[in-house]
Amino acid sequence: AVGFVVEDMLRGPRLVLADIGRDVEIFFGEGGVEADLADDAQPHPAFARLSQSYDVQPLDDVRDLAKRRILLLAQPRAFSPTELVQLDSWVRNGGRILILADPALQWGSLYPLGDKRRPLFTSMLSPLFAHWGLELVLPIADAEPMAIRKIGQLSIRTQTPGEWLKIGRGGSARCALEEGGLLADCKIGKGRALLIADADLLDTVYWEGRGMRVLTGGDEFGNLAWVESLATSSSPII
C-alpha cells in the first residue's frame, strides 16, 4: 500500500493524498517499485503540480490517519472490512475526505486486462458508499463519452463520468448532490466527505493540453484546480 502525506506550505492545513494500493498511478508511473525508486523517476504531472504547493511525504496505512485532517483517495484498491470501519470512524471523528471513484475508468495502462497491476476498472468502495446512503452508477445516455462540465468558472473535461444516487433513507450520513450528481457533499458525524463520481479527470490527457500550455502557460481545462479547491474547502454545501 502506497500513499503520500501533503502539508500545505502556504495556507497551513494538512492534506493527505493517498494512492493506497497504487491503482491510479498518480505518484509515479507504472514502471513498478524499482522504477519509482530510480534517480530519474518522474512523478505524474498531477502529483508534481500538487507538490508545488504541498510538502509530500509517504503514507502506507489507514491507521496512520489518526493525526491527519484531510485525505484524498483516487480509485483506490478494495479495502478490507476493518479498513472501511477505520476510515468511516476517522471521518466521523472530524476527518475530511475527498474520494474520486470511477464506475468505468478509462485511464491508460501499460498492463493488459486482468493484470493485478492495472488500475481498477470500477470503484470497489460500494460498501462504504452504501453505508453513507449513496450508490455510484454509470448513466446510460446517447451522448458522447467525452464530457465537458461547467463548474463555477471552471471547465472540467473527462470521460464516462458517473453519477451519485441516494439510496434508502440516507444511511448514516446527510448528503447533498451537486453538479448533476457528479459531486456528493456529505456530513458524517463531525467530519465531511466530498465524493466525485469520476477519477479519469486526474489523467493528463483530459486537462493538461500541451498546445494550450505552450501558448498560455496554463492548463486547457480546470480539472486540477477543481480537485484542489474541494480538497482544501472548509465550507460545506449542507
What are the roles of these predicted feature ranges?
Residues 1-238:
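Short, surface-exposed patches at the edges or C-terminal ends of soluble domains, predominantly
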